[in-house]
């Protein structure tokens, strides 16, 4: 594995290992419980952008992309140490697909930003103490950022 990917792999493993197991569990559960709604809202926002509409149709989103993104979100936010290598490969494959169909890295990054923005109200609506909510958000955002970094690098 190249040095860069080894560094990201090590950071991802460190993030998982340093995250309280309850926070990891709550984050995975949040993703599982709310992924479909998050993804529906995500595509509502994304498809309103005229530049994105050049690449995606509502039919494509409904037929293929919603389920793929739902699975991606759940997989990233529930990733365990033994799954990190597969997650890195999954991000590289996702980058290949995005590049092949002509979706630029800036649009992918916009999508990540929107997804992270949509997570905050969901986390804040949970009944957990503020410190736990902050830990969930920290873990979720850093997990998404690591996935995004691998994906961007693969472009």
What are these regions (language model features)?
Residues 1-6, 10-19, 23, 30, ...:
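Long, amphipathic alpha-helical coupling/dimerization segments that relay conformational signals between
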């Amino acid at each position: 594995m190249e040095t860069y990917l080894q560094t990201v792999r090590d950071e991802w493993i460190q993030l998982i290992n340093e995250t309280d197991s309850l926070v990891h569990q709550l984050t995975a559960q949040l993703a599982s419980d709310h992924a479909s709604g998050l993804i529906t809202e995500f595509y509502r926002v994304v498809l309103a952008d005229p530049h994105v509409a050049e690449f995606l149709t509502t039919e494509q989103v409904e037929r293929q992309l919603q389920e793929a993104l739902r699975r991606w979100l759940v997989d990233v936010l529930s990733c365990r140490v033994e799954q990190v290598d597969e997650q890195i490969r999954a991000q590289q494959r996702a980058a290949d697909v995005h590049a092949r169909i002509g979706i630029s890295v800036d649009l992918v990054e916009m999508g990540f930003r929107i997804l992270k923005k949509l997570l905050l109200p969901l986390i804040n609506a949970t009944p957990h103490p503020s410190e736990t909510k902050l830990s969930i958000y920290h873990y979720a955002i850093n997990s998404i950022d690591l996935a995004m970094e691998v994906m961007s690098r693969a472009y």
